[in-house]
């Protein structure tokens, strides 16, 4: 990065962190986020898309971002709005299907050919509703209604021991609870389960899950990087779960609006399990399914930027 590039990237990060102190639902944050999305497009998106044109990369291609340093904290997947071929009001995710990866080696591992399983995966659903995430129960019902086979661990059944036992038998997992990242110790990051018990990423790594394919982390702040965590080069909870062996992971950049969880989950799983994907492994459907679900969310009346920019995909 040139000094000017680095200075502008730092300025965008500082603008978002400063506005966030006013609250994610404040007009200050909404204005700051809109300004940052446009500047990201001007700084990164415009030259990248021009290069895609030179290389004849077609629209709707998969694109993986592997950011470092301060760029790890910025929403590259949602740059815009973009004017393209007379079309206005488009964002990067309208033109391409964006994903992230914490490192190139993690992406190579996630996309490594293996035994392709085309039968419908069973989903482990882990939910820990409380006063801060009351929508977890409705989200749970939506996941159950739109997935072919679901095992549910909720409330007092959601213990670390129970989750680890069931993870071995499921290729998909949907976790709707609080997540916490330990700065400088990514594998001490954890999900808060029954009575404050914690399932750490180190527990998952040690369990060795050869069939793990996809994790949906509907927990708070699973992909968020703060000023203090920038030095960790983007290894936050979402990226760390990919390191645990899951080929694809969906997370959030900040606290999710409670009303968005059920709608987005329903749209997402309906797309993943639709009939149109002949010959495509289920975990490889998740990036496009998330992109389409977010676009549907974006079309809602009075939809704020921070609500739809929030969702990110990592991995294959």
Where are these regions (language model features)?
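Charged, well-ordered internal alpha-helical segments
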Residues: 1-121, 134-138, 142-144, 162-175, ...
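Short acidic loop-to-helix transition motifs that present clustered carboxylates
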Residues: 153-162, 197-200
């Amino acid at each position: 990065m040139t000094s000017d590039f680095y200075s502008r990237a730092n300025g965008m990060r500082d603008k978002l962190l400063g506005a966030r102190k006013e609250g994610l639902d404040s007009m200050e944050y909404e204005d700051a986020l809109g300004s940052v999305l446009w500047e990201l497009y001007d700084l990164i998106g415009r030259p990248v898309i021009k290069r895609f044109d030179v290389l004849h990369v077609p629209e709707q291609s998969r694109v993986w971002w592997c950011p470092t340093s301060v760029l790890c904290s910025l929403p590259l997947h949602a740059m815009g709005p973009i004017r393209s071929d007379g079309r206005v009001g488009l964002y990067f995710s309208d033109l391409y299907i964006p994903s992230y990866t914490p490192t190139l080696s993690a992406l190579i591992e996630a996309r490594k050919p293996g035994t392709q399983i085309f039968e419908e995966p069973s989903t482990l659903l882990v939910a820990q509703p409380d006063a801060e995430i009351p929508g977890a129960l409705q989200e749970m019902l939506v996941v159950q209604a739109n997935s072919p086979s679901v095992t549910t661990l909720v409330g007092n059944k959601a213990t670390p021991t129970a989750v680890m036992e069931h993870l071995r038998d499921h290729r998909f997992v949907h976790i709707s609870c609080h997540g916490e990242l330990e700065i400088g110790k990514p594998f001490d990051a954890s999900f808060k389960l029954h009575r404050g018990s914690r399932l750490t990423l180190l527990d998952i790594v040690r369990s060795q899950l050869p069939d793990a394919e996809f994790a949906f982390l509907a927990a708070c702040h699973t992909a968020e990087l703060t000023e203090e965590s920038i030095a960790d080069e983007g290894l936050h909870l979402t990226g760390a779960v990919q390191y645990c062996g899951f080929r694809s992971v969906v997370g959030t950049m900040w606290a999710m609006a409670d009303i968005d969880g059920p709608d987005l989950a329903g749209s997402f799983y309906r797309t993943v399990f639709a009939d149109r994907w002949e010959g495509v492994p289920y975990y490889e459907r998740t990036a496009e399914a998330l992109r389409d679900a977010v676009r549907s969310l974006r079309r809602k009346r009075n939809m704020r930027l921070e609500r739809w920019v929030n969702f990110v995909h990592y991995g294959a």
